[in-house]
């Protein structure tokens, strides 16, 4: 890190900033990957060791790039449980995704998240939902066929960055809840 960071006593997401994952984001979008799954993906050794540009599974590339790590292993079935190595990597990755999934540019992205947080904290839900709708305003025609997953991914990114526990497509004995948010 530079001396400016030491002087300001701010270190940011150094690990994340050193490797821009644009290729990975494009891979996730190309294969319509459900982002919520990434934090608890399960797979086997064969998948982890396979990198094929034609594969519809982006997980091996993301794992081998270091954005996911092994969190557990089930010896009986040979299944690995993956997740982000730490909060810094997860937050950096999710922040990087926002401009690629929502109608917001990279410069405005951090300010939009601050506005979301302030609106929730102040109880200004009308402004919150107007801002959220603007994130979907320019959804391209190519996204329409995978529209539900696109919306789930945008909501997951926004609410994750706001600091909510987010669970997409939560299954209960009575059916499915599209999105669960928990503030505490």
Task: State each model region's role.
Residues 103-136:
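C-terminal low-complexity, glycine/proline- and small-hydrophobic-enriched intrinsically disordered tails
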Residues 8-61:
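Conserved helicase/translocase motor-coupling segment
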Residues 2-7:
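Short, small-residue-biased leader/transition segments that mark boundaries at the very start
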Residues 158-183:
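Active-site metal-binding core of divalent-cation-utilizing nuclease and nuclease-like domains
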Residues 45-51, 136-151:
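A short, highly charged nucleic-acid-interacting micro-segment common to nuclease
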Residues 83-114:
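Short, amphipathic alpha-helical interaction segments positioned at domain boundaries
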